[in-house]
Amino acid sequence: HLGEQDEYQPNNRGFDEVFIHGCGGIGQRFAGSQGDVPKNSYFDPTIRHNGKFVKTKGFCTDVFFQEALRWMKNQKDKPFFAYIPTNAPHGPFIAPDSYKALYKDHTKGDANQAFFGMISNIDTNVGLLMKKLEEWDLADNTLLIYSTDNGSAKGSKIFNAGMKGGKGSLNEGGSRVPL
C-alpha cells in the first residue's frame, strides 16, 4: 500500500533483497490496481525480484515463503533480518483446493472456505519456517514476530471474535492487532 513511488520501495528503505508483488495487490480487480502486471493471480504470480519481473509457480503465500527460506538459508551463518508480509488473507479470497476443503463442512460459501484456507496455508508456511530454523540451528537465536496489519476485511460476525468493526474501522475489530 505504499504505491509505486521509487523512494518508498523496499530496496530504497534498507532492504538488500526484495521479492514483492506490485501496487494494489495480487488478484485485485479495481481501477488502478496491478498497473505493473495486469491480470496477475494468486496462483503462479509474476513477482518483482530485485527490480525484475519473474514468473513463479505455486500459490502466492507458498511462493513468498519459499523465496524467503531460500534467502535465509544463504544468510544463516550471519545475523539477518527477514520480513515476510503475506498477501493472504486478502480479497479476492482464493486458496488452494486442498486448503478450502478443510472448511467445506464447517462454513458455507466458497469465499469463506477460501478465507479460512488462506489462513491455514499461512499456518503451514509458518510451521515450515520454524522447522527450517530448527534444522539450521537458528531457532534458539531467532526472534520470530507474527502479527497483522488490521482487523478482518471479511466481516465481524464470525471473523473478529465479536469485536465491533473490521478493516478500515477505528473500532476494536479494525485496529486491534498483536503488538
Which residues fall in each region the model found?
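A short beta-strand-to-alpha-helix junction
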Residues: 54-64, 110-124, 138, 161-179
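Active-site acid/base region of carbohydrate-active enzymes
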Residues: 82-83, 137
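Active-site loop->helix "elbow" adjoining a glycine-rich segment at hydrolase catalytic centers
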Residues: 2, 118, 150
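Structural cue for short, hydrophobic secondary-structure segments
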Residues: 83-85, 146-147
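Short linear motifs at secondary-structure transitions and domain/linker junctions
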Residues: 36-39, 57-58, 119-122, 152-158
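Formylglycine-dependent
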Residues: 2-80, 86-95, 104-107, 113
